[in-house]
Amino acid sequence: MELPAVNLKAIVFTHWLLTVFACMIDWLPKAYGLANITILAMGVWAIAQRDSIDAIFMFLIGLLLTILTDILLFALYFTEAEKASESGPLRDLFRFSSGMGIFSLLLKPLSCFFMYHMYRERGGEYFVNLGFITLSRDRSSYQSIEHMDPPADQDNKLPSRTY
């Protein structure tokens, strides 16, 4: 099964837009915006250097880490911010902002999946095997090197030394 072609620019732009929408109202700490914008800067680095394995790997690891930090920050700050904005004039804006933050969090694992495949296309060497899901390249067209024919020219072979 072939994966759909997903542009790295589209992934970075989507996460940037969702991060901006999530930070529209001041209900999350500055760590949320700082972490996500820093990771998106790594995404811009991965766009700028198309052949860099390090850039795409750092972006992938950063997205994985922001999944954890987003879960932690939402768990710590959501209920208090919801109670504070429940009867105020910013209730709808809080709902929109928190919805965009949650949507960004839900979209990050899919983005990580596409980032991993881009990493493998650029020459990355990490394999992931989850039992029923195997992420690897099809190498059936490669010739095996285990059964190579011996060279025909063995006259130039050096004699073995005895010590």
Swiss-Prot record:
Pfam families: AGTRAP
Membrane-crossing segments per the record: 29-49, 56-76, 96-116
Assigned keywords, A-Z: Membrane, Transmembrane, Transmembrane helix
Top-level division of the source organism's lineage: Eukaryota
Residue ranges that the UniProt entry lists as topological domain Extracellular: 1-28, 77-95
Cytoplasmic-facing ranges: 50-55, 117-163
Cellular localisation: Membrane
Chief location of this protein within or outside the cell: membrane
Record SMART domains: AGTRAP
Any single biological process term in GO: angiotensin-activated signaling pathway
Gene Ontology CC terms, in alphabetical order: membrane
Its membrane topology: Multi-pass membrane protein
Record's function text: Appears to be a negative regulator of angiotensin II type I receptor-mediated signaling.
Protein known as: Type-1 angiotensin II receptor-associated protein-like
Organism: Xenopus tropicalis
Gene: agtrap
